[in-house]
Amino acid sequence: MKHLTPKETWALIQDQPDALFVDVRMEIESLYVGRPPGVLMIAWYEYPDLTPDPAGFVAAVDREAHGDKSRTVVLLCRSGKRTLDAGVSLEAAGFTNVVNVLHGFEGDLDDNFHRSTVNGWRHDGLPWEQM
């Protein structure tokens, strides 16, 4: 798995428009907090049980990739943690070009327990939208 900063990820997506850009957060998270435009929503887990479904996740990504396991799959979550597990599952299923977005959409907590102030997609000033 490759690990890229948000800015490196944005450059990759611009250079590879056929890459699958997947947000693994729950839909409600992205609605409240925001998300990059054009990102695919494929949750790693869902409310209320919050239990990951690796097989379901891999199957959903595989459908979007039309079975092309060499297609670049870029994974984004809140802070870059869920994407690690999701990426491992994709690699175990044979995907060969998996990218984890370091620090995720909101980034790490600062000293006051706030996000988007230290690092992450929003912090870096990259395009995002809120529904």
Roles of regions detected by a PLM:
Residues G80:
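Conserved G/P- and acidic residue-centered "switch" motifs that form tight phosphate/ATP-binding loops
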Residues L76:
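Short, surface-exposed ligand- or partner-binding patches at beta-edge/loop junctions that are enriched
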Residues M1-L20, E27-T72, T83-M131:
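Rhodanese-like catalytic fold shared by cysteine-dependent sulfurtransferases
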